[in-house]
């Protein structure tokens, strides 16, 4: 199964949730899952902290084969690399991508707004 994880990962940020990081670790280790990318969104923290924290997590885990993409800063900020990645990846793999969205849903709304098909 090809998966994109859309999340607000703050695993490693003091006094923050760890669920997103654990979700990624589970998906990445599962033999039937191919993680196509991680799209970062705000919620547990701002998009900057979430993005750079996710990059740090990937470095700590020595994972270099999964792209990490930064989402918009606020609701309605739909023109971001995360939105473009979601739209492009789904369009290039029709019917093959499962999006697991566990963050603010801003990237999902942006992808739908950009390309409702």
Predicted features along the sequence, with ranges:
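N-terminal acidic, glycine/proline-rich low-complexity segments
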Residues: 1-117
């Amino acid at each position: 199964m090809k998966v994109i994880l859309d999340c607000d990962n703050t695993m490693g940020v003091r006094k923050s949730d760890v669920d997103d990081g654990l979700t990624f670790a589970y998906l990445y280790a599962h033999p039937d899952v191919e993680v196509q990318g991680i799209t970062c969104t705000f919620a547990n923290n701002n998009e900057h902290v979430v993005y750079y924290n996710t990059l740090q997590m990937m470095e700590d885990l020595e994972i270099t084969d999964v792209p990490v993409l930064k989402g918009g800063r606020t609701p309605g900020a739909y023109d971001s690399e995360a939105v473009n990645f979601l739209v492009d990846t789904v369009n290039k793999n029709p019917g093959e991508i499962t999006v697991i969205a566990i963050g603010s849903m801003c990237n999902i709304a942006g992808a739908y707004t950009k390309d409702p098909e």
